[in-house]
């Protein structure tokens, strides 16, 4: 099958699209979406299935309308994977579904399937996973070696607006007791310097390492003795749960029904339900290397069937059984397809269409016609076609 992913965010590009590719399907990744290039991608690639997922720059209300209009003109199923559920179901997922009108919705929250079905949208559960080419075990690296690590953004503003969310409880159980006791945690992620209100004291600046690229996280998971993994909900698992275990990390997480439903605490990972338990288990496992390493091995085994290839296969099984699609490939980026036929330009911050036209010695009108623009408004990251490439025939003549 040919699957078109309307996505540009690295966190999602390395997951489900690669899962489909490894399952033998041909995948095109759109990159930044525009009103014009959606139609061109569909016309040139001729996908059997179109997938959108998450909450990224490709999900502005304007782009939702573009996607809906382009996909409804063709008889190709549009699927949306709601990865922001349940925290943003009301303020994001449901408005998106009403605007974009997908043919099927997958959600990471099982209980929401009935909600979407009641709206007249076919739905099913699809959990997070990990991709083995990104999250795999390596030998510990000195740069990331430490006793305890957290790889996550802090989200202080979200916690301020939503103090009732389970993430707040997870934070108070797993992180706050250690910080208050002066036990070092090394943090990778944004805004941990703003968390004193929720932790009870300032985190020392030399414990905070800032943003870590998504593709580098496995190095921390493989190098730290203990990885603390916060949970956002009691009824479902975070994506990092799978990624940490897939990378061979030793995971300390919240004691929730979802964790116990999937894993066996003390065998695959360790859990805590109180600050006291957190302190006790951290002290114990930092001093019992052999037990810790045994749990690491078991944790990796526990997610062997939770790769994104498994999720891709599951998605297709559901779509076939629900009548959305009928009964081996490579990953293709739309920009590479364009390069075969056109001279292209990636818009950088501050550039205007007039500046680009002057740079390539073409008229503004030519650029607007070639790219089907109705105005000269462009944005950083956009791919602009400049002109068709010239080719030589067998008589060495340009055509």
Swiss-Prot record:
GO molecular function terms attached to this record: lytic endotransglycosylase activity
UniProt cross-references to SMART domains, sorted A to Z: LysM
Subcellular location: Spore wall
GO cellular component: spore wall
GO biological process terms held by the UniProt record: sporulation resulting in formation of a cellular spore
Occurrences of domain LysM (ranges): 343-386
Predominant location: other
Keyword NAD belongs to the record: no
Cited InterPro entries: DUF3880 (IPR024542), LysM_dom (IPR018392), LysM_dom_sf (IPR036779), YkvP/CgeB_Glyco_trans-like (IPR055259)
SUPFAM superfamilies, per the entry: LysM domain, UDP-Glycosyltransferase/glycogen phosphorylase
Record keywords, A-Z: Sporulation
Domain notes: LysM domains are thought to be involved in peptidoglycan binding.
Note: Expression of ykvP is regulated by SigK and dependent on GerE. Inactivation of the ykvP gene does not affect vegetative growth, spore resistance to heat, chloroform and lysozyme, or spore germination in the presence of L-alanine.
Annotated protein name in UniProt: Spore protein YkvP
Gene: ykvP
